[in-house]
Amino acid sequence: MKLLGRVALALILLAILLYGGAVGYMYANQRALQYEPAGPVIALADTALANAEEVTIPAGEGSIHGWYAAPAPGMPLIVYYKGNARSFGEEHERYERFVADGYGFLAFDYRGFPASPGAISQDGILEDALAAFDWAAERGAPLLLWGRSLGSGPATYVASQREAKALLLETPFLSAVTVAAERYPYLPVHWVMQDQFRSNEWIAAVTEPVLVAHGTGDVTIDVSNGERLYALAPNPDSLWIVPGAGHSDLWAAGIWAEAKPFFERAMARQ
């Protein structure tokens, strides 16, 4: 019996050590798990954005880099908040469509992503997001916010702190820590995760009309995140759920055809 007790104790201690090691690994490597910034910087000259320009925007003690195109007269400007991977320029086909339909845009890399130097953190991303909005506001056009995936967090935060015409959230999380808890249900992510992006709290202060777009086939951020976040919006406009669509499928699925009338409705409001 004594031997069995010792074996049981040893197994318990081993389980504790393994669990502690898993928690320690997550804590030490959490930003490497959360962000995928590596990738090429797309040259503006290699796109069809003939009237866009490269811009450098002061943000905190550094700066962020992006592209800007002014809207057609009387049209609004989309401030675009990218996801957690690679560089903003890889989505140039979206910006080309915005411009073709008369919309202006500002898109950029958060600090620590390919086009903008620095270290990645939630505080830095939120500071960059506000700096981009404030820079765009100085241009004088009405502003529309579009946040995709990770970008839904800073877009929601900015909408809670500034006045825009509309907030579009594409494949958003309820919060980043919600997604982490879904992926690692046996780890105390609420205690150890630094960059939690609590959109579920920020959205309470969002007065702009909100469109949430998501797909039922999204295995990166489950569609329930978008549905739950939309339910919390004080000024919900529309919820667009695409059957079978994955995390990166909504542009091809026609999100722009949903976004344009949403933006037009928002612009028509006083």
Identify the residue ranges that each predicted region occupies:
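Short beta-strand/loop motif that positions the catalytic acidic residue
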Residues: 205-207, 212-214, 218
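Membrane-embedded segments
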Residues: 63-135, 139
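An N-terminal hydrophobic leader/cap segment in hydrolases
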Residues: 15-56
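N-terminal Sec-pathway targeting helices
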Residues: 1-16
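Active-site nucleophile elbow and catalytic-triad environment of alpha/beta-hydrolase enzymes
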Residues: 188-202, 208
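C-terminal catalytic histidine-bearing segment of alpha/beta-hydrolase fold enzymes
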Residues: 227-270
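Primarily recognizes the serine-hydrolase "nucleophile elbow" in alpha/beta-hydrolase
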Residues: 135-186
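Conserved alpha/beta-hydrolase "acid-adjacent" motif
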Residues: 219-225
